[in-house]
Amino acid sequence: MSPPVAGAASSGDGPPGRPPRELYTIPASSGWFQWDEIHETERRALPEFFGGAGGSGFGTASRNPRIYREYRDYIISRYREDTSRRLTFTEVRKALVGDVTLLRKLFAFLDSSGLINFSASPSRPEAQQQQRQTEAEAVVEAPVGLQVTPRPPPSYFAEEKGGGGNENGFRLPPLTSYSDVFGEWAPGMAPICGLCGMECRDGNAQILKDGFKVCSKCYANNDNKGEANIHPGDKKERIDNHSSSAWTDAETLLLLEGVLKHGDDWDLIAQHVRTKNKSECIARLIQLPFGEHMLGTVNGKLDNRLHKIQTTDGKVNKSTVKESSSQPTETVDDMQIDGNEDGADKSVEEHPTKHRRLFSSIDITVSLMEQLAHLTTSTSPDVVAAAADAAIKALGNENPQARRAFQLSEKEYQTRAFSSNHARQSDDVGGGDRDVEMHGHPDKKQGKMFISTTYQVRAAVATSIGVAAARAKMLADQEEREMELLMASIIETQLKKIQYKIKHFEELELIMDQEYATLQQMKSSLVDEWQKVLKRAFETGVPISRDEVLIKLFQNKPNL
């Protein structure tokens, strides 16, 4: 490479048999460049084409020294077609195929080294840079069809008279937010004026035709306050002083007291508070951290009171309780309570806001023996008798004295039967509840009766447990039988499917046999026709063709 020279390209003197060489100006720092070799500077600047950062080895099929030289030579040759014009990456990219990132990196390396765009006009880069800056800047202008006008001064609203300038009587102040004007009113805050954006602290608010609220001061300053501008249904809204004030401790205590007394009857709660309306009471209770929990506790107390009244009052009619194993909820209907109750108990008749289970499947007021009797009625008498015998035998094996508690002579049986009948007749004649007083029985006899009663209770409990176990065993056996039945049906269905498949395969096999027989017939007919054709050919004196060998082979081939 010739040393750098100043000025434009010139023609050099060469041998008489060679064409004149063209000289191109490059910076002195790029004197290492040679067309036939790849310098170490290029390897360090672009290690992707040389198999790593060290420059040793080869890359992939699209990244190797040969591809690099083709890219480099093309870019430099393209620039030297016209050295006065600045070469751009877009022009080079249209003719090269490869990784855009590597091509841009190679182009930047050649440009910074001065191998391209060194002799181009210096004014071109500045113009392009200025053009790029112009394109990057955002143009702020009004959309098509929209005319931007300056905002009138504040005195415009005071000086404007009549209905010509302000048709709707509503203009937003400069710093009014959307939530202040169009947002919902929050508890504890006064309404926001739509003109000045301030709170209406005086307690008066006017509703315009558009539905916005304005304070009394803005409404007085605004001349457009005729009957046509005011909403026909809401000409004036009087807001109490308590709406703009925050909740005090006394009001909160009254609210909690009203909730405890009236439950979820918000009309009565608002009357109890007196200074707040229904919506404010609801919002305040929701804002309290324990509001929902307190409301749930109140509903629970009402349910407990209902349960207590239903179980303890002697004049309560029996309620209809629908019990089902598949439906855990129960309803209590036709409940009538006699007696004088306060006004708070009237709210009990109302249905709660949520479905609650008022009673369990077994009432706690029912005696143990009644519960055991209820359990034993769910099975057959034979099972109950067997369970009772087993329980008595188990107690007898545990303690020999337990057998005496279940031994009853014929005389004692008749005595107890007579006493029970006599007591029943006396109850029918006298009526009412009578207290039975036990006199004259020694303590020893009472102790024996207590022991026998204890063993009887244990026997009853064991009987109920045995009945429950027997019922569970019966249910388990029933489920097992159902499972066996389902399994048998599944096996039968699978066997039917297999039989259908076997039948289908047999039909397919029969069809294949028929097709095979048809093919054999066609094969034999073709052989016969070929033989006839050859025979006729021999008779007419036609020379034997080479197909005769194939026919003989075909004839000698055994049938499949």
UniProtKB/Swiss-Prot annotation:
Component of a multiprotein complex equivalent of the SWI/SNF complex, an ATP-dependent chromatin-remodeling complex, which is required for the positive and negative regulation of gene expression of a large number of genes. It changes chromatin structure by altering DNA-histone contacts within a nucleosome, leading eventually to a change in nucleosome position, thus facilitating or repressing binding of gene-specific transcription factors. One of its GO terms (cellular component) is nucleus. Residues 1-22, 311-352, 414-445 are annotated as: Disordered. Residues 311-330 have a biased composition (Polar residues). Interacts with LFR. GO terms for molecular function: DNA binding. The lineage of its organism: Eukaryota, Viridiplantae, Streptophyta, Embryophyta, Tracheophyta. This is SWI/SNF complex subunit SWI3A homolog. Residues 1-13 have a biased composition (Low complexity). It holds the Pfam family SWIRM. Residues 331-342 have a biased composition (Acidic residues). Residues 242-293 form the SANT domain. Residues 343-352, 424-445 have a biased composition (Basic and acidic residues). It comes from Oryza sativa subsp. japonica. PROSITE patterns: SANT, SWIRM. The gene is SWI3A. Its main location: nucleus.
